[in-house]
Amino acid sequence: MISLVNMANMQASRGLTFESGWKLDPPTIEASISSLAADCDPRWVSYQTPYHPESFRRVQSYVKFYVPYELHQSHIRDHWITPADSGVSFTTEMLGFLLDLSLPIIDNYLPNESTGGQIASIAAGLEQEKDREAGIAKVIDPSSGAFESPAVYLSLSTTIEIQKILLARGAKWLFMRAYAKQIKNGRMSMELVIFDESLELVALSQQLCPSVELSRMKTSKERL
């Protein structure tokens, strides 16, 4: 592993500043933070990944995702995120972790072979909503985290750029968009951007993510 870090005091930074005119394209679907917090925004559904220590998606259980009902395009994943623990806030130090936490893009292209795509996340979120209304809170995945997926996605290389320091008390809500620029021969080039509640850019990341097909991993283990 090779890591290069360039640090600076952003609060003391001074220099030329201009409005570039850059915006998200397509624009994000409108959301009300108060409605999201109350799980009543008609355009978004909440989804929390059930935790199980043997699940390869267990790390996502620390964040509650809000997924739009409307699907932009298959190569885009939009989410509002908030800590699963109501006593926690997102801090600047957590941004590197959050930038590696997007729900999987490739699963959008394989809806019949995976449970991580947007359609599956919406369906799971609606089931969780029914459970909440019935007074059922599922925090453990009883099936050993057996999420269906054709492959495991790895971060081979990652660059992270912090554009804004979060407040010292942290942030309860952030918006994240992940989008693939190319998916070819088992390699995905993608970018992730994080915004605060006012949709001001906080951080961005470029990533190269190879995919390892689970069937190939199983075959390799059997040969050992």
Named regions from a protein language model:
Residues 1-224:
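Terminal targeting signals and extreme-terminal segments of soluble enzymes
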